[in-house]
């Protein structure tokens, strides 16, 4: 058996097109969704992420409200701006790019985001609702939502399945486990203290890896015919046959490559379907952010 490779780029593009079509319909009625992105400082990775999000907004017809602060902004000033955005009727989603500088309490800032504009899904109220039966939050975190979306679009049967989640982070592991549980999967969360890990993983019809350990999941940990979703993103050096690092002619530095938490080449011979790294879960995050922003706007417009 050779697994179907789940093309996250293609699925993300389909979602963006769906969002764009709905946004176009809303704008024709004079209703424009708006997403505010708040960034503090100029970390290259944060700037890159925020720029990508703002560009996607423009492509889909979503109003992009960019808010930039210097690294030394006071917590009070940042807090005041977030509260202002929370009360702005033209803003339907607020994203505060993390990490924030050390002198700012991230929890205080994130808690100031209106729960009906918490498109990242990290407000304690939304997280709490995610864990309560019958209390579906308006938003769930984007990457876990992307995992579920990929499974759905691949035709995976979630209800009644055995799902194993490797990792218990607040960003991916816990929320994806709760989303799977909410879809009536029988869920096991594994972590560094889990005993007989390979045996537990082999029971999974759906295996989600989100631990940040390169190629940790090997073929002997995967049940034949399982759906394997690799959320991990790890950087490894590119090596010559003799084991020495390959040096880039352009930069003079060792070349690196991205790999996931799953040994892709081995596991693809066992699984029914698998996400690659890169090109699997990664592209889904911004697509689901746009979908959450649209959802927030529809909620504000009384259309949900």
List the predicted regions and their residue ranges.
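Short beta-strand elements in bilobed, periplasmic/extracellular small-molecule ligand-binding domains
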Residues: 35, 57-72, 187-189
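Short, well-structured alpha-helical segments in soluble
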Residues: 77-89
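Short beta-strand segments
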Residues: 39, 95-99, 166
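Rossmann-fold NAD(P)-binding glycine/threonine-rich loop
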Residues: 107-114, 118, 127, 232-301
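Glycine-rich phosphate/diphosphate-binding loop of Rossmann-like nucleotide-binding domains
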Residues: 40-55, 134-231, 236-245, 254-268
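Positively charged, low-complexity intrinsically disordered leader regions
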Residues: 1-31
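Short beta-strand segments enriched in small/hydrophobic residues
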Residues: 32-41
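Anion-binding alpha/beta catalytic cores of soluble intermediary-metabolism enzymes, centered on
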Residues: 93-159, 200
């Amino acid at each position: 058996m050779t697994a179907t490779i789940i093309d996250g780029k293609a699925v993300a593009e389909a979602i963006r097109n769906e969002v764009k079509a709905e946004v176009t319909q809303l704008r024709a009625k004079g209703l424009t969704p708006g997403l505010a992105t708040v960034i503090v400082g100029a970390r290259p990775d944060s700037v890159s992420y925020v720029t990508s999000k703002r560009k996607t907004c423009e492509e889909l017809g979503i109003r992009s409200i960019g808010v930039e602060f210097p690294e030394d902004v006071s917590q009070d000033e940042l807090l005041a701006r977030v509260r202002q955005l929370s009360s702005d009727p033209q803003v339907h989603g607020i994203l505060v790019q993390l990490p924030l500088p050390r002198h700012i309490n991230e929890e205080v800032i994130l808690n100031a985001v209106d729960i009906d504009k918490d498109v990242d899904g990290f407000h304690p109220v939304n997280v709490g609702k995610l864990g309560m039966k019958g209390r579906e939050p308006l938003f769930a975190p984007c990457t876990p939502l992307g995992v579920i979306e990929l499974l759905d679009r691949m035709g995976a049967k979630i209800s009644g399945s055995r799902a194993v989640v490797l990792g218990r982070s607040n960003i991916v592991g816990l929320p994806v486990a709760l989303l799977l549980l909410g879809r009536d999967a029988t869920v096991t969360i594994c972590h560094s203290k889990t005993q007989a890990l390979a045996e537990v993983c082999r029971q999974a019809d759906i295996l989600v890896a989100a631990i940040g350990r390169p190629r940790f999941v090997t073929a002997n940990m995967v049940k034949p015919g399982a759906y394997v979703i690799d959320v991990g993103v790890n950087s490894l050096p590119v090596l010559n046959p003799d084991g020495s690092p390959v040096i880039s002619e352009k930069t003079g530095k060792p070349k690196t490559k991205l790999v996931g938490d799953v040994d892709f080449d081995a596991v693809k011979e066992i699984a029914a379907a698998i996400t690659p790294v890169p090109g699997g879960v990664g592209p889904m995050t911004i697509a689901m952010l746009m979908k959450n922003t649209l959802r927030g706007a529809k909620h504000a417009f009384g259309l949900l």
